[in-house]
Amino acid sequence: MIFVLDVGNTNTVLGVYDGDELKHHWRIETSRSKTEDEYGMMIKALLNHVGLQFSDIRGIIISSVVPPIMFALERMCLKYFHIKPLIVGPGIKTGLDIKYDNPREVGADRIVNAVAGIHLYGSPLIIVDFGTATTYCYINEHKQYMGGAIAPGIMISTEALFARAAKLPRIEIARPDDIIGKNTVSAMQAGILYGYVGQVEGIVSRMKAKSKIPPKVIATGGLAPLIASESDIIDVVDPFLTLTGLKLLYEKNTEKKG
């Protein structure tokens, strides 16, 4: 079995693959202060809960956009799994033709998503990932990673509104009854949700205009189902796109090792 870890700024998503099947997955808070032992005990509990042991795992791959956490995670893998993890970063084989000015600037999460997206859905392709930041990735019909856009995530914007406007409360991100809010909470929900729907439709439409062949639009991340339910511009919601990409990269980089 392969253990995959997608470390984001807010949450870390973990998964266990048995062949091509995602057998188990979990979402935990990303903590920069946890030690290797704390991570080890937490992951041990998650594995044990589904009847697995450290020894059931034969390979590990990690994608992270939080560099300070990597030391603890790498040491945890060595200490508890007795496995040196594969890290998504410089030197890893991706198969991507990256046309960024500096390819090293492309985040690990965006690379992993692109690998999975091309494998599952072909090209051209636009991938929207609703995380701490909302990222847009454009892959052309030649499977070249051309770049994209990065915007503040919906939660960042919501928290900023709460923090900067004294009379506005902290709210849950949810669909309001009407676009015309009748109270402060519903008005904020309408502005946040439909404001983001408008952002997605605007950016994706402009990216689509760059392609002679209509690209498929894939959304992933925690809020993807909510946003997609309010817009026809998203073709597919794939909640496990990043985990799939990690599995594919693990296979690509270990296939000669058996």
UniProtKB/Swiss-Prot annotation:
A Gene Ontology molecular-function term? pantothenate kinase activity
User: Coiled-coil stretches, from where to where?
Assistant: none
| Catalytic activity entry | (R)-pantothenate + ATP = (R)-4'-phosphopantothenate + ADP + H(+)
Per UniProt, the keywords (alphabetical) are: ATP-binding, Coenzyme A biosynthesis, Cytoplasm, Kinase, Metal-binding, Nucleotide-binding, Potassium, Transferase
Q: Give the EC number.
A: 2.7.1.33
Q: Which GO terms describe its biological process?
A: coenzyme A biosynthetic process
Residues holding ATP: D6, V7, G8, N9, T10, N11, T12, V13, T132
Q: In which pathway does it act?
A: Cofactor biosynthesis; coenzyme A biosynthesis; CoA from (R)-pantothenate: step 1/5
Q: How does it assemble?
A: Homodimer.
Record protein name field: Type III pantothenate kinase
Native species: Geobacillus kaustophilus (strain HTA426)
- Could you read off the lineage of the organism from its UniProt record? Bacteria, Bacillati, Bacillota, Bacilli, Bacillales
